[in-house]
Amino acid sequence: MGVTVDVTFKSLNKYSEILCGDTVECLKTEDSDVIILADGMGSGVKANILSTLTAKILGTMFLNGATLEECVETIVQTLPICQTRQVAYATFSILQIFNNGEVYLVEYDNPRCIFLRCGHVVELQKYKRLVKDKEISECRFQVQKGDALVLVSDGVTHAGVGKSGKYKFGWPWESVAEFVSEQCLTSLSSARMAAALCAECSQIYEGKPGDDTTVVVARIIDRKPV
């Protein structure tokens, strides 16, 4: 039995910023769904440009069969250099879910993907390697009906920094995963899970996000014939 993917993404802009510095691309191939989350350095217009370029480059090259090395090299050569910091920087996660349930996950400097089965967090066995001097994590695994995969930008794990509440040093990944796990047990909807996680981030930020905050939720459901 094949699977299909119910995907929802939602973002909170950094307080007072018009543009979001995170970009999400959802693409389809003949046999898979590809989800890309890119987070540009900083915030506002510059971050938006960095993340948009990164997501578009990864999506276009990935779909055309380019290797991961070729994708990363192109990003490094293409992104505009920040005049202040003298670097071009954007983090990213790539999640490719095949119709047969196979998954390929690539992560560069983003918070770890949260993988849930029966509402419980499952640790993923990842392999790290250097690609153009950047440490990239890769993972291949199998999903089944009812599983959920959650990608987040670091605005989620930074929620609460500088505030006086419980998470004044940030919202730990483990606590984020626990929250998502509880949501997964009570809802089969990716939209509800994404909305709940974003709402919780906003509450922790006291309504004034200190960073661009993006959540992507992918629920695995039965593949239905058209």
Predicted regions and their residues:
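Catalytic core of PPM/PP2C metal-dependent serine/threonine phosphatase domains
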Residues: 49-119, 129, 136, 186-223
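Small-residue (GG/TT-enriched) beta-loop-alpha framework at ligand/catalytic clefts
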Residues: 92, 101, 114-143, 149, ...
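Primarily the active-site beta-strand->alpha-helix module of PP2C/PPM metal-dependent phosphatases
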Residues: 23-78, 142, 150, 162-177
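Regulatory cytosolic signal-relay segments
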Residues: 1-18
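Juxtadomain coupling helices with adjacent low-complexity linkers
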Residues: 121, 158-195, 200
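Acidic loop->beta-strand submotif enriched in PP2C/PPM serine/threonine phosphatases
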Residues: 17-30, 123-162
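DG-centered beta-turn motif at the end of beta-strands
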Residues: 39-40, 110, 148-156, 212
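Short helix/loop capping segments that flank catalytic or ligand/cofactor-binding pockets
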Residues: 45-47, 116, 152, 159-161, ...
